């Protein structure tokens, strides 16, 4: 969703910025490599799902200051009243779950935005005083340490975000869910959906009518 706003990078673009900082590409192992192709080849940044996690982890392990600087430089502090954000609030969903780090949703001028409370940490759920949430399950750029991007962040997610993960699982269990612009390659999303399918299969829920989910993706 954020990619529809000028200056906001995609997940791949953010990892490409980190890869360039440590001179990492797929060229050294590419079987299509030619001496003259390195600067124009589109395959050099065609990272696997595994690399999308390991590249930021390598940057962090090598230089934490560089890691956080790339994050802050790659994701601008934009608080635009994005039309798509406003359209989401017009639907008036029970809750909004986002993997984006920016503040485009909560900065919307849509009148319904005021009904929602931002949730970044487990403690935010415990202290919430509103009935609707914007759950930023991968953190917020205002606190770079909260961001879930590198491999270790994903490995530690279930331990560090116990309440948020449980809450998301409960929403997927008894709500109709609209996935808008999500990458179903996201490690957290795949794990949660896998858990949900397992629970349904173990309890015979596939044999009865159940709530459905909808997925909208950009074909590009």
Describe these PLM feature segments.
Residues 181:
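Glycine-rich adenosine-cofactor-binding loop
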